[in-house]
From Swiss-Prot:
Keyword Membrane: no
Enzyme Commission (EC) number: 3.1.3.18
Superkingdom of origin: Bacteria
One GO cellular component term: cytosol
GO terms of molecular function: metal ion binding; phosphoglycolate phosphatase activity
Pfam families: HAD_2
Binding sites annotated in the UniProt record for Mg(2+): 12, 14, 177
Species in which this protein is naturally found: Vibrio parahaemolyticus serotype O3:K6 (strain RIMD 2210633)
UniProt name for this protein: Phosphoglycolate phosphatase
Function: Specifically catalyzes the dephosphorylation of 2-phosphoglycolate. Is involved in the dissimilation of the intracellular 2-phosphoglycolate formed during the DNA repair of 3'-phosphoglycolate ends, a major class of DNA lesions induced by oxidative stress.
Family in the record: Belongs to the HAD-like hydrolase superfamily. CbbY/CbbZ/Gph/YieH family.
Pathway(s) served: Organic acid metabolism; glycolate biosynthesis; glycolate from 2-phosphoglycolate: step 1/1
């Protein structure tokens, strides 16, 4: 099955193109411990990511996917501030691209597709990370989690892209690893390509019913009918 009319492809970042949890986990652990809360592990943080940094810190402080109502707004705000500082200081040295990512982006670029990045990650961290991993040149638009009032699964970023590039929903594809990515696509009326690796709170991506499910980003080339 292919989507031969696709013109615009929107990609998630964390868990889709980049395994960033090792750096996120270190920063989250440093932040919660600085506030006198118990340490969090990389394994825990793999479940906590996907809904933006504020939610990540709330979950880390709560040691749970459900954020404790006992946490004050001031405490969560301080935790977020500390997290941002520690994450910025990390230099993102532990993060790495998943296999086939750079090669796939290059082939899509050569084939003439318009590509955008739509992530719930805070915008200020994204350009440096894309440059560091040599993939910034592939994206005409980079939309962080604070680019609009609402994050994925709200479709506002995808709707904005369609309007900017004058494409119909049938001409756009959302590529991601989490329920939020697939729901954002459904809410925007466009097709979705779900990756089985990445971060989806322990739930198989197939449970969100994406239009396509793949174990590797390279399978996207076949979906959009790029000849190898």
């Amino acid at each position: 099955m292919t989507q031969q009319d696709i013109k615009l492809i929107a990609f998630d970042l964390d868990g889709t193109l980049l395994d960033s949890v090792p750096d996120l986990a270190v920063a989250a652990d440093q932040a919660v411990q600085a506030l006198g809360y118990p340490a969090v592990s990389e394994e825990q943080v793999r479940d906590y990511v996907g809904n933006g940094a504020d939610v990540l810190i709330g979950r880390a402080l709560s040691q749970s996917m459900t954020i404790s109502s006992d946490l004050s707004e001031d405490l969560r705000a301080k935790g977020r501030e500390l997290f941002d500082d520690f994450y910025a200081q990390s230099g993102h040295q532990l993060s790495h691209l998943y296999p086939t990512v750079k090669e796939t982006l290059e082939e899509l670029h050569q084939a003439g597709f318009t590509m955008a990045l739509v992530t719930n990650k805070p915008s200020k961290f994204v350009p440096e990370i894309l440059e560091q991993h040599g993939i910034a040149k592939y994206f005409v638009d980079v939309l962080g989690g604070d680019a609009f009032p609402e994050k994925k699964p709200n479709p506002v970023a995808l709707n904005w892209l369609m309007e900017k590039h004058q494409v119909k929903a049938s001409e756009m594809l959302m590529v991601g690893d989490s329920k939020n990515d697939i729901l954002a696509a459904k809410n925007a009326g466009c097709a979705s390509f779900g990756l089985t690796y990445g971060y989806n709170h322990g739930e198989p991506i197939s449970a969100s019913n994406p239009d396509f499910v793949a174990d590797s980003l390279s399978e996207l080339l076949e979906v959009v009918a790029v000849s190898a």
